[in-house]
């Protein structure tokens, strides 16, 4: 999911499986609910025999502090496990005002680009 999105990560997973290699999710979403939700979806949709243990699910969320983008988490991590959110998208609701406030650079793409 950190390789350009979930679709790119799934491509890498297919390559790893063909090569007989393990995947290291490499994430530590101890702060970001959105990142942890993406990780949960990726790990749940990837065969377990391909995955190394994931940092997100070892340390849990909220270790660093509350997440301003998703202050009311829809899922939790306990003892290294979680249920994948089943709401639309990644299953978490983002606070739009916080997203605007935390955006560093915005690019607008139109049909003609």
How would you label these PLM feature ranges?
Residues 89-113:
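Extended hydrophobic packing segments that form well-structured cores
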Residues 1-81, 85:
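Shared catalytic-loop signature of beta/alpha-barrel
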């Amino acid at each position: 999911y950190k390789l350009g999105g979930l679709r790119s990560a799934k491509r890498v997973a297919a390559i790893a499986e063909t090569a007989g290699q393990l995947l290291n999710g490499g994430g530590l979403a101890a702060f970001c609910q959105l990142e942890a939700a993406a990780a949960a979806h990726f790990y749940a949709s990837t065969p377990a025999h391909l995955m190394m243990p994931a940092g997100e699910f070892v340390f849990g969320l909220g270790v660093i502090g509350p997440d301003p983008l998703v202050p009311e988490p829809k899922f939790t991590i306990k003892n290294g496990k979680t249920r994948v959110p089943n709401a639309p998208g990644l299953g978490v609701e983002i606070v739009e005002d916080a997203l605007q406030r935390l955006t560093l650079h915005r690019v607008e793409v139109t049909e003609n680009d």
